[in-house]
């Protein structure tokens, strides 16, 4: 009996600590600061820009009997409200538009991944790095 009471007390204390902090144990989907590499085919430089992207956890479920039932749609942390900013890459030859746009997350949500606007995961062919020499400093429009 004493062992059961001790176990119950330990469980209540551990849950109380999580409730008292009022912070989720895992960060939910929200905008975070990130650095992106920006380059364009035909331009000889790469620039890094600071922006906000969506990151964090979204609740998901998996079926126990996957062979019998169709899979449940999985949600990801994605943009709710987004604006695009543009920069001008220096040194682009004539005939190449030097303007490149990148997303700035204003708010995020958990929802289906849209390949048209998001990286939906999976293996990458190459890391997200610059192919051209990196230039410091930004030329915002």
From Swiss-Prot:
Single GO molecular function: hormone activity
Main location: secreted
SUPFAM superfamilies given in the database record: Cystine-knot cytokines
Subcellular location: Secreted
A biological process term (GO) from this entry: G protein-coupled receptor signaling pathway
Glycosylation sites: 33, 50
The name this protein goes by in its record: Lutropin subunit beta
Species of origin: Pan troglodytes
């Amino acid at each position: 009996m004493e062992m059961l009471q001790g176990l119950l007390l330990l469980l209540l204390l551990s849950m109380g600590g999580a409730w008292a902090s009022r912070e989720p144990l895992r960060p939910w989907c929200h905008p975070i600061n990130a650095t992106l590499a920006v380059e364009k085919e035909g331009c000889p430089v790469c620039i890094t820009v600071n922006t906000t992207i969506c990151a964090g956890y979204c609740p998901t479920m998996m079926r126990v009997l996957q062979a019998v039932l169709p899979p449940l749609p999985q949600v990801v942390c994605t943009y709710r409200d987004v604006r695009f900013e543009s920069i001008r890459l220096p040194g682009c030859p004539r005939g190449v538009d030097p303007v490149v746009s990148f997303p700035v997350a204003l708010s995020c949500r958990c929802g289906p991944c849209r390949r048209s606007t998001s990286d939906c995961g999976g293996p990458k062919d190459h890391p997200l790095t610059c192919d051209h020499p990196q230039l410091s400093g930004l030329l915002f429009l």
